[in-house]
Amino acid sequence: MDSVTKKTRQDGSEVTERQGGSSSGLKTSSHTGGSGVEKRSYTHSSGYVTSSGSGRLNSSSSGYRQTQSPSSTLTKSPGSTFERKTYVNRHATYEGSSSANSSPEFPRKEFASASTRGRSQSRESEIRVRLQSASPSGRWTELDDVKRLLKGSRSASCSPTRSSSSTLPIPKKAVVETKMVTESSQSVSGTYDTTILNTTLPPYTWSSTLPAGSSLGGYHNSMGQSSSLINAMSHSTGSVFGVPNNLAPSSHALNTGLSTSSTVFGVQNNLSPSSSALNASAASAAYGMKNTSQTNTMNSTGVSASAGGTILSSQGDDFLHKDCKFLLLEKENAPAKKEMELLVMTKDSGKVFSASSTGLNGGSFAEDTLKKEKQGLSSYAADTGLKSDANGGLKSAPTRDKATYAEIQNGGAGGAIGSAPSWCPCGSCCSWWKWLLGLLLAWLLLLGLLFGLIALAEEVRKLKSRVDNLEKINHSFLTVNQGNPYLEKDVSKVDFLHGVAPSSTFPFENEESVWLMVKSRLNKEIERGYFRGERGEPGMKGDMGLQGPKGDRGLPGVPGIPGPVGHQGPEGPKGQKGSMGDPGMEGPMGQRGREGLPGPRGEPGPPGFGEKGDRGAAGPPGPPGPPGSAGLKGPMGSPGPQGPPGPPGLQGFRGEAGLPGAKGEKGATGPPGPKGDQGEKGARGMTGEQGSRGIPGPPGEPGAKGPAGQAGRDGQPGERGEPGLMGMPGARGPPGPSGDTGEPGLTGPQGPPGLPGNPGRPGAKGEPGAPGKVISAEGSSTIALPGPPGPPGPIGPTGPPGVPGPVGPAGLPGQQGPRGEKGSAGEVVIETIKTEVSSLASQMLSDLQGRAGPPGPPGPPGESVQGLPGPRGPPGLPGPSGPPGRPGSSVSTSETFVSGPPGPPGPPGPKGDQGEPGPRGFTGEPGEPGLPGFSSHGGTVTMQGPPGPPGPPGPKGDAGVPGAPGIPGTSRGGSRQIQGPPGPPGPPGPPGPGGSSSQEIQQYVADYLKSDNVRHYLTGVQGPPGPPGPPGILTTADGKNFDFAELATRVMSYVTSSSDHYQSFASSVSTTSVLYQELLNMLQREEIRQYLVGPRGPPGPPGPGVDGMSLSLDYDELTRRFISYLTSSGMSIGLPGPPGPPGTPGISYSELTAYLRNSEFSGLVGPPGPAGPPGPPGIPGSSGISLEDISAYLQSVGYSSISGIQGPPGPPGPPGPPGFSGTGLLSYADITHSDEFRSELIQYLKSDEVRSYISGPPGPPGPRGPPGPKGDSGLVAGSMSSLYHDSLASERLHGGSIGAEGSHGGSLGASSSYGSSMSSSMSSYSASMGSDGSYGASVGSDGSFDGLLTAEESHRRSAGPGRSYSSSFTGSLDYNELARHVSENLQSRGILQDLMSYTGQGPPGPPGPPGPPGISRVFAAYGNVTEDLMDFFRTHGTVRGPPGEKGERGYPGPKGDPGPMGPPGRHGQRGPKGEKGEKGEQMYSGRRRRRSVGV
């Protein structure tokens, strides 16, 4: 700004004005007290306004000293709103201008703006004249001309516009503009301004245009608060451009101004922001703003009308438009002028509006600008006068008088007319003030009246209430009189008179006394009635209402200015309108009048008396009304629906996200994603027998993963190759910690599958030991399943079974008999079981108690201990592991839970330690699941006949890696072949808690699994104990022999009678009798009996187990528990019974292998043997197994494509009578609401225990897997990675979608282990499953992990490239191929048939030995399956690294669904596989369920 600084007083506020082109200085005047006019002249040059403008103004950053005048409105009024000040506008230029128009004093400076001054002045005068003349018309055209003139002087142009509100202001503005101290300044200013404006207020570029108000205001404001100039006014911003500034405060832009009259000027008025309406007018944009404001305040109407409408629109657009131009143009006077004109136009309206303003003329307050100019005019009347100082002279003219305008026009000369100095607060302030005062007084008066009225009303109400009360009293008497009692009384009286005994109805003993009393009361009432009438008078109290005094105040309230107000004013303190006082009086009178009303009321009262009484009588009825409230209850109903059902359906997916949450719901589990993993396991479930293998628990390390194992997938494959299942579980095994899961022991039921015993071959595998760590999802993250597994050492024999897990389906495989040794495998169980068993086992144990148990005996796991292979755990994949035939281990029911006898051992649970089973790693070969054959499939269950033969599926190889299937272990869903034990489950009771209640059992199982002893079993099936012996005969607590027939009957009846769960089961079963028979046969089967009978003997604890069973073997209870367990496990019906050793799945492949080898399930493990310790097959082993584990396992096994996940289900081996396992259980499972199963499975998976397995750490992977839709074709497609990805993608999507999949899909990372493994398996499964995507789906379709792979894979294969599996079935396991085999196997068993997904899948046929499930190095290494799997995948590429991220894309995964087309999978029937099928079935159940959901 120029160095020159001036201080002037405007409105009593001191304005410091700096002149000079420099923008730095602002002149602000604060208006005092809000003269409304800011007077601020921010003169600083426009510069001030410029950028600094905003700052300055407000802060008065540079010289701008803006005091806010009291008038808060403007506070800065932004410089008087218009002050134009244009600050920007050159206010600097105008030296006085600062406010340029805003303050009259400045105005003169403004007028005298430097070079333009002369021109400005004349222009100003001209403008004023025009404005005034135009004002009426409201046409701003003239203003436009004026603006042009003003524009000539830049400031003029802008300012004027700004002034718009008051005509004067515009000129002022011009003056101000002129004021620009020099042309140069001006120019500079202009430029500067422009820039500044643009900068500051870019919105309106006006620099000068800004009408000061606007701009100014804006600037002002800007300075003030907004950054825009407007800011100061901020509201004022409203200034026109304030709009831009919008002054933030206010709402409309202009309006916003503080109402501030919008615009700066309005600002002044601003005070009255009230005019908010005006605001708009204020909007009027600077011009008139001031006026507007005032007007506004007063009226706002006027303003509104003209200013608001015109100005706003013109101003808004034009101003902005023009203003910008102005800024630009200002330098160019001519164009600028044009713009100015526009502004002027606006101004005119402002003027009009000003006129509108009430008393004030637009000029006076309305035009603050004018006003300021007028300020010279001291009185409001003077308001009309405007001051303008063209050359520093002020002109003041009454706004109203055109003459004044003319004056202004002419001379602008000096002195303001009516010259209260513009700075004189009275100029605008007084008026403004008076208005405020008047308004306040009026308000007070009104408030007084209001309060008076309120008081009056209150009084009346009180009187009324009193009257009512009296009436009520009277009525009560009257009523009584008239009412029954009295009437009766009368009657009585009459009777009495007649000699009739008084009626007893009347309460009073002495009727007469009553009557008298009534009478007296009535009399009193009458009296009261009169009183009541008197009371009515009290109504008079209304007088209080007078509050006359307030009324007086109110009068003052009327703004003195307005004549009326004035009157009141006098009356009020404002002596002025003393006369008005009379009116004030009237006001009170009015009140009295009202009071009078009450009086009348009084009169009516008396009459009312009688009537009222009657009415009173009527009143009573009212009461009834209340009852209505009851309705409320309705809402409660809603809870009923409670989602329970829902969860199941979506559950799978939903669970995903909710993983944990979902868990609660099983359905919610929706995330099944994790479940998905389990699902895999599920498939494994079939492998359940394999479960025994699980004992290898050592692999447990993967435990965590194990759960992930998802054996679910395997499960299907389980059919394929029970071993596979086991393997996976193996992985789970690692979770050793899982061991704690002890509960899973429950899986025991799976036990029956244990039969596979033959597998023994894996024996070697035992080594995994280390992993013992199996983490059990169960509570402890890592259960060191390892623990005992060691002992299982003997695993040797079982060895092969190793992984069979998956074989699950093979379940029946013949009696692995030898498998008993597998005992060790139990460990695996822990993982899976742990997780699954925990829940399943508890139930199952309680129900089946030991269901898995029997498998327990897996025979001395001996070898199974297999060292802790822990790491091996993952092997779980063993997946294919031939038909574990012996679901024995069936721990499988649980996902992981290797079916290992552990289940029943459950209690043996103490073994809890699954810990080590890890080593079980090798599921050995699940070999012949043999047992599984039994599949409870429901009617289909053909008992599978002991697939026995399948047993040796031969190397089936643990491929079992499928481990994942683990879950399937028990076929929790029921779909799953329940894998293993399920069948036996029933009686397993003896094992351990057996007798206990489900929860107890669950506890036992958990404890057992967790305990070292059990862990051994679970892990290694430890079972060295070999079949506990109890197996032989189950004895009930009462000492009776266990009657299998009874058990079968009960189970059947329970199943059939139990809710829908089983209905479907029943339906699926051709006939209940068939199922029953099958079940009975299964139960009686040696393998199964072992399960049922006791915990697999080996379980050591079994003894206790036996006790448990012996506690009291209530067949009904047992059955119930068994089923409940299965159901809770997600198996629809555990019935399937043996189905499947597959159970594994909880165990890592190694565990399974070891377990199976050691257990009677060795056969089950069977072929898996080759799978060798599929090693960590990773996931499959148990849900615990992570994808990576699975991946590793798979790779080791050769399923590179599926990367461990599936773990090679291991060729189901010749599951032997597939019929039994796969179909029966599967069917049954299918029947049993796959959804339910899925939900349960999901829930289970979601449960913390399981989740730890499954999810394990979500696994870093976050599977990138989703990589792409690939899932669709990729599905299993060639590589695990693709599969995995696909699955991840789809799954993730799917599940992920699900969220899916919850942890699984979504996190893949989270789910990662489980998710991952699930993912891959799921992926395939998912693909096939499609939406199901989640574990459940995978399980749903395959049931076991394997199954999953199987169906899925097969599906995939068929759908997508069949790719490796089929090609290299013998060689590396191609999951696709494997899936196909498994699917075929399952189908052959009839298992898949139920699955929607694979309708046609031919039985996967033995998956073919998956080849050693390949231990998941990772899995085995740690319990963290997820991590392992992820690592594995990453390492091998199977998992695309964390594809997880990508995973999202996975949605394509759903494409996978098409996979189901897989039917082709039918492949020749792997008939034998069926055994595995058992396992598979269990898994199936779960998986399938999922699948169906998915589907």
UniProtKB/Swiss-Prot annotation:
Q: Where is the composition biased (Basic and acidic residues)?
A: 1-17, 1472-1481
Q: Which residues lie on this side of the membrane: Extracellular?
A: 457-1495
- Composition bias, Gly residues: 1296-1308
PTM summary from the entry reads: The intracellular/endo domain is disulfide-linked. Prolines at the third position of the tripeptide repeating unit (G-X-Y) are hydroxylated in some or all of the chains.
Region (Nonhelical region (NC16)) location = 1-535
Basic residues compositional bias, start-end: 1486-1495
Region Nonhelical region (NC1): start-end pairs: 1483-1495
Among Pfam families, the record links this protein to: Collagen (PF01391)
Topological domain ranges for the Cytoplasmic compartment: 1-435
Q: Does the keyword Lipid biosynthesis apply?
A: no
* Membrane topology recorded in Swiss-Prot or TrEMBL: Single-pass type II membrane protein
* Protein name as annotated: Collagen alpha-1(XVII) chain
The organism named in the record is Gallus gallus (Chicken)
